[in-house]
């Protein structure tokens, strides 16, 4: 009998994807196959090639010819004999029972189906694994839907907020420039998530072990850069606000370019190093695996930024406590505590303080809870930041009302702008009264006014 024809080229991709889904919640399988699993799949490819070459060299027999069934090479066998082989080695990674065998019988009609059943059942992956696979599929689809909604809302809100801060010149100042860069980092992060999902899940590049395409790797590199840049711009927000409160006098223009370097330059440095190292040492798959020592090139700077921002957050809350403390100790006044609570809640999304909850836990600790918190809750952070620091900002609302009154008057009364009375100040007055002109007052008054501009909702 003739040997079976080779399986389609994408069969190994399907095998890798199925094995990844079957293992469900354990951390490594949630994102892709590790190097050990990839080694097994590579071994299967080698065995497949060797089996087909040997089958072509063998003479025709009256029994069953050598056959490759996508996992095991069955030797040429006379009719009437049963061949018993051990389960493929790859099943030992996730089957609790070891030492299981599979068999086929050579008959006049050829090889019989696999006994005692298909590989998943015969080698220890039974209904429990299938049920787990189905549950995890539902869970991951729900998570993907959740963060897709969150990033979509954030993207829409951030685009509008960035346009507002960019178009109205009276809102141009260092503080709002930093806000705009933070908004842009959130926009890039949301966009990169959609591109990565398109490259990894909505395309045929599901094999995490073969050499991925340049486009797929580029999508992952872009995603990692945007995520790191977003964390570093959260750090810049913390550094800027802390500097306003702690430093008597400083050049905002000089510091601003330093903030630009921290927000965009530092992440690009780490990502370039990570990219070069992966090309030389782990250039397999689509670079979406995170369970190797190389992942710390990205993870360590992000953890450091989260920790520093949390420390800055605690220090700023301490300054708030001092500033909002009632002057009369004997007087009972709940207003300062209410303002402190509002200020704290206002700063949490700006500093990304919520990330500290799971930042220093192992990746496989409460993996599903961590995934929901970081992916779904984190996806709405950009929307919350845009609402708090643009749409609910007093300066923005005042400028929008002023523009609306002018447009309304021009539309209803036909007024021309050249006949309008000049505004009370030049472009940028709104921000200059909040930040730039603070250099003309005492350090304590300057720090107080600047901070009040940040927490104008309180």
From Swiss-Prot:
Disulfide bonds join 38-209, 51-73, 64-106, 87-123, 216-286. Keywords: Cell membrane, Disulfide bond, G-protein coupled receptor, Glycoprotein, Membrane, Receptor, Signal, Transducer, Transmembrane, Transmembrane helix. Residues 1-31 form the signal peptide. It is found in: Cell membrane. Its main location: membrane. GO terms for molecular function: G protein-coupled peptide receptor activity; peptide hormone binding; vasoactive intestinal polypeptide receptor activity. The chain crosses the membrane at residues 143-167, 176-197, 218-242, 256-277, 293-317, 340-360, 369-392. It is a multi-pass membrane protein. Residues 32-142, 198-217, 278-292, 361-368 are extracellular. Glycans are attached at residues 59, 70, 101, 105. GO terms for biological process: adenylate cyclase-activating G protein-coupled receptor signaling pathway; adenylate cyclase-modulating G protein-coupled receptor signaling pathway; cell surface receptor signaling pathway. SMART domains: HormR. InterPro entries: GPCR_2 (IPR050332), GPCR_2-like_7TM (IPR017981), GPCR_2_extracell_dom_sf (IPR036445), GPCR_2_extracellular_dom (IPR001879), GPCR_2_secretin-like (IPR000832), GPCR_2_secretin-like_CS (IPR017983), GPCR_2_VIP_rcpt (IPR001571), GPCR_2_VIP_rcpt_1 (IPR001771). Pfam families: 7tm_2 (PF00002), HRM (PF02793). The keyword Transmembrane helix applies. Residues 168-175, 243-255, 318-339, 393-458 are cytoplasmic. GO terms for cellular component: plasma membrane. Gene3D superfamilies: GPCR, family 2, extracellular hormone receptor domain, Rhodopsin 7-helix transmembrane proteins. Belongs to the G-protein coupled receptor 2 family. Interacts with ADCYAP1/PACAP; activated by both PACAP27 and PACAP38 neuropeptides. Interacts with VIP; the interaction results in VIPR1 activation. This is Vasoactive intestinal polypeptide receptor 1. It comes from Sus scrofa. The gene is VIPR1.
């Amino acid at each position: 009998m003739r040997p079976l024809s080779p399986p389609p080229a994408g069969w190994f991709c399907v095998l890798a994807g199925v094995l990844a889904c079957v293992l469900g919640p354990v951390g490594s399988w949630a994102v892709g196959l590790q190097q050990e699993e990839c080694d097994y799949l590579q071994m299967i490819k080698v065995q497949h090639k060797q089996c087909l070459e040997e089958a072509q060299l063998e003479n025709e027999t009256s029994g069953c010819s050598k056959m490759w069934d996508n996992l095991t090479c069955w030797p040429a066998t006379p009719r009437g004999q049963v061949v018993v082989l051990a389960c493929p080695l790859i099943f030992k990674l996730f089957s609790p029972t070891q030492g299981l065998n599979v068999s086929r019988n050579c008959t006049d009609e050829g090889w019989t189906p696999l006994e005692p059943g298909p590989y998943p059942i015969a080698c220890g992956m039974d209904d429990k694994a299938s049920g787990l696979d189905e549950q995890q599929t539902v869970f991951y689809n729900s998570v993907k839907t959740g963060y897709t909604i969150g990033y979509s809302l954030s993207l829409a809100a951030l685009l509008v907020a960035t346009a507002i801060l960019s178009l109205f010149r009276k809102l141009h100042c260092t503080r709002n420039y930093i806000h705009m860069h933070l908004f842009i980092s959130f926009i890039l992060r949301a966009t990169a998530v959609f591109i990565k999902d398109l490259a990894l899940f909505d395309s045929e590049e599901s094999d995490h072990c073969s050499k991925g395409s340049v486009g797929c790797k580029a999508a992952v590199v872009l995603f990692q850069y945007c995520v790191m840049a977003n964390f570093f711009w959260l750090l810049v927000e913390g550094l800027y606000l802390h500097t306003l409160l702690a430093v008597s006098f400083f050049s905002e223009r000089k510091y601003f370019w330093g903030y630009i370097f921290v927000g965009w330059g530092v992440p690009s440095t780490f990502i370039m190093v990570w990219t070069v190292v992966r090309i030389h040492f782990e250039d397999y798959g689509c670079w979406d695996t995170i369970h190797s020592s190389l992942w710390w090139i990205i993870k360590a700077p992000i953890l450091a930024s989260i920790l520093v921002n949390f420390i800055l957050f605690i220090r700023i809350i301490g300054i708030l406590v001092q500033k909002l403390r009632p002057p009369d100790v004997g007087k009972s006044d709940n207003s300062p505590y209410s303002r402190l609570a509002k200020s704290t809640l206002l700063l949490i999304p700006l500093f990304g303080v919520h990330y500290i909850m799971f930042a220093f836990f192992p990746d496989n600790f409460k993996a599903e809870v961590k995934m929901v918190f970081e992916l779904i809750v984190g996806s709405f952070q950009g929307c919350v930041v845009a609402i708090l620091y643009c749409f609910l900002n007093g300066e923005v609302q005042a400028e929008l009302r002023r523009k609306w009154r002018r447009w309304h008057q021009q539309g209803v009364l036909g007024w021309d702008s050249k006949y309008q009375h000049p505004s009370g100040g030049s472009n940028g007055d709104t921000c200059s009264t909040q930040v730039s002109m603070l250099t003309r007052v005492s350090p304590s008054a300057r720090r107080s006014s600047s901070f009040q501009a940040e927490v104008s909702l309180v």
